[in-house]
Amino acid sequence: LLKKVEQIFVEYIQSDDTSALEQKSLDIFWPVLEESALKAIPYRPTLDERPYESWSRDYHEDVVNIHINNVYKPDSPLSEKRPQFAAALIRLLEDTQELTPEVTKVACGSWLNSVPTFLEIFPDVWKASGQRSKNVRYTLGHWGQFMDRRGDFHARNGSRFREMGDFPYPSLHCTDSLEAVLCHLREKFPEPIVKRLQTKLRRIPLES
């Protein structure tokens, strides 16, 4: 497939209009993409599989790195599921404190750190610490912005990407102390609400 696309690229390399290049390349890839899409089975994890729902984590020295993948589709973790999204993060950070007390910092590299409704979850220090990633990797941290809440292609962001020649939402690496992030979350999401959600989430599979 790549050889065929390479031949098309060479054919149109001098052309200012990329329409033919794009269409002919898509014609090559489309049968493979369509077959894969038709076979795809929606991922519906349970709490046993993803105990922190849309959040996951890994560790490096005294830092817990947090990662995001929307398991609430077609709902959004930043609107309909916002309290549940925050409650799961609180639980992740509380468990981190209990299980790995040597970990004192939280970090995340994601395009979501360029989205105001996501940044509201975190303290001002987190927002101010943002550093743009130097390397573009094949991860949701960069490319997740081209997927909408249903898991389909985000056409508006795709169009902006073409117009700008850059990511609409740059992937930023942000960090703050674990305790500061927890304090901010508890203040923004009152404890009674969070406690009810945490109790409920420990029992109910995500697809329920």
PLM regions and their residue ranges:
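Non-catalytic substrate-recognition and accessory regions of acyl/acetyltransferase enzymes
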Residues: L1-P77, D95-K105, P116-S208
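Charged, low-complexity surface patches
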Residues: F85, A107-C108
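Well-ordered, non-membrane alpha-helical segments in soluble/globular domains
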Residues: L78-D95
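An acidic- and aromatic-residue-enriched active-site/binding cleft used to recognize and process polar
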Residues: C108-S114
